[in-house]
């Protein structure tokens, strides 16, 4: 089953995961300080949470099962 809107939410979630990884790498490399890193992490985590909640709500409204949701590649 393929659903463009759900796929878009999944892509947003995955983009947030990639951004979070990039932030962690830059922080570990000493390129951004702890305060900036914390703000970026919070912003990205908020984005991930919104994308996931939107995807769940969309799936419920359109009768997409939990099994079908799990079949999407979220990470």
Name the predicted role of every residue range.
Residues 26, 33-72:
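Short, charge-rich amphipathic interface segments used for partner binding and complex assembly
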Residues 1-17:
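Short, charge/polar-rich alpha-helical segments
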